[in-house]
Amino acid sequence: MRNTFTLALIAFSFFAYAQKKTIDSLTMDYTADKGILTTYFKPEKGKLLLALNDSVLEKPLLMVTRYVKLPANYSAYRNAGSKTAEGVISFELKEGKLLLRQLSYVNLAEDADPIAQSVVQNNLPPILGVFEKMNSEEGFHLVDVSDFFSKDSPGFNAVGETEKKNYKIGSLDSKRSFIDRVKSFPRNTEITHTLTYPAAAAPRSNRSETLSFQLNHSIIALPEKPMKSRTVDHRVGWFSLEQYNYSSEALKSDNYRIASRWKLEPKDKEAYARGELVEPIQPIVFYLDPATPMKWRPYFKKGIEDWKGPFEKAGFKNAIVAKDPPTKEEDPDFSPEDVRYSVVRYVASTTRNATGPSVKDPRSGEIIESDVIWYHNHLRSYRNRYLLETGAANEKARTLNTPEEEIGEMMRRVIAHEVGHALGLPHNMKASSAYPVDSLRSGSFTQKMGIAATIMDYARYNYIAQPGDENIRFVRQMGPYDDYAIEWGYRYFESDAAEKKWLKDFVDTHSLNPIYQFGSGGNDPNAQTENIGDDPIKATAYGLSNLKIVAENLEEWTTQDGQTFDDLQELYMELIGVYRRYIYHVVALIGGVNETRIVKGQEAIPYYNVSVQKQREALASLDQNLWKTQKWLLEPELISRFENEGHLDLIANLQKAALYRILN
């Protein structure tokens, strides 16, 4: 009993002694870095301490987690720069401890409304971490967060559930996990750490049965005053965040969506009000990844700055700027993982894709930062489809050694598309049906208007233009819908009433014009992917006519003496895919329902069936181009160049799938 009492007394005395020690004495052998969260780091011991000022407590902080490095062949869509988690956190002082909570801004109510109390009670923020307070002095509270950032703590999402199952990933190995580096700035703190896991079925080429990940956490202060939000109009496409207002008079919680937008305000508001072009206080800046090959950088920059024109429609000049990555001398703190920098990432990956995700303030929809991601092998996708879809009418496409300026032009437009996502715009699959089919055979029309009304559709190439058509634009470009959508999202207003009226009038006067319509798919045959033109039957007829020419010349255009037929086989398989897309554009007419997004008072029918006559024409087209054996796809001289015993099944399965879709 006496020993127990003695031990307790010693422990209490030690605790009391520790509390008497100053923060300086407790951190004297640590590397200090002052910022929004003052950090004390001792890498040789794996120790990280945070000193939080009272001014930070219970303030919303945005925490974004990204991969810095990850294992080879881990996932097609998880790469360096990919976001694994994003959320708002806050630190709360409670009984000598600091709690780390995750906040939500989905369910809301006016502060003065009694129901606000119920909203709070029924939306308790989860606790992600609890830290014993080491000391407090002069408004600072010192805590040890070493374990939190050395383990797989809640909210990191380092390992995806699918990958965890597929690779049989076990629990974190703490002996092989550690904090790498820490950096703090006035508005953000960056913490990088390595996490290691055993994996009984690791990805191919990994025989160690071990997976290590390096992640970066950006903790950034959100604006003291949230940006004024803009409620979405369903007739204009915008990425958005859903919120529920329990102070609504609608006899239920009023759910609505707020648009995801960058905060753009004019430097000279009086000049802006006069209709003059004005620079924003803070432009949108995208840096190129240091890993971007030099020869592609000019095209990436052009793709980013293609959006300058649409922003001018909204009254802003130089609203978006592309920059090379700064040197260490220019900006020693630059890091693509730092949430202060928006970067177009160039990823060494076999994935054929590109993406444009962004980080948002959930209170207002303000876009804080975005990282556009370009996957290296996406180059091959565009080269192949350029040949297959335009080669019949476009001499420059009839080779696998596509001219650099042609590849660069395609990359430019892909970057512009992904930057559009980063600005808040989703895909608009309706826009590719805005133009009359035969206008896409006109050089003057396509050079001025492009091949679709927006860069945000999956309308990549002009497959309608025929051999002999002159001065044709074959690659997509910015369109009138892009001007329209950006003006809706970014035009600045001082008055809420003026904003509401102007936006409604603006959409009311534009939204029934096909070039300004928005649609996202479903059963609407005019909102399909990879199509162009207002008549799927006619467009497909032109496309198939061209594809037959390409098939006849495929070997000549893809192989040279002394080479294998691997490229020929790859292009043949992709040619079948192009054929399938053209056919399915017609299939969509059968049982299709045209959609026009309207509001009460507009003279249009929101939903109407495709006419019987048009559906019969579609069946006749399928009878000619699908049900009858397409011998041009099965030429023995072509097929015999490579072993493909399943080529007959490819066509048969396509026929079956189309029939199943029609009947169901």
Provide a role label for each language-model segment.
Residues 1-20:
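Bacterial Sec-dependent N-terminal signal peptides
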Residues 19-292, 310, 314, 325-382, ...:
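Auxiliary tRNA-acceptor-end handling modules of aminoacyl-tRNA synthetases
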Residues 55, 82, 253, 290, ...:
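Soluble non-cytosolic domains of exported or imported proteins
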Residues 57, 295-319:
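Zn2+-dependent metallopeptidase catalytic core
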Residues 305-316, 420-421, 425, 461, ...:
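Sec-exported extracytoplasmic/periplasmic mature domains
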Residues 324-347, 409-465:
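The catalytic-center signature of Zn2+-dependent metalloproteases
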Residues 355, 360, 366-374, 412-423, ...:
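Extended catalytic-interface subdomain
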Residues 432-664:
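Conserved catalytic/binding loops enriched for acidic/polar residues
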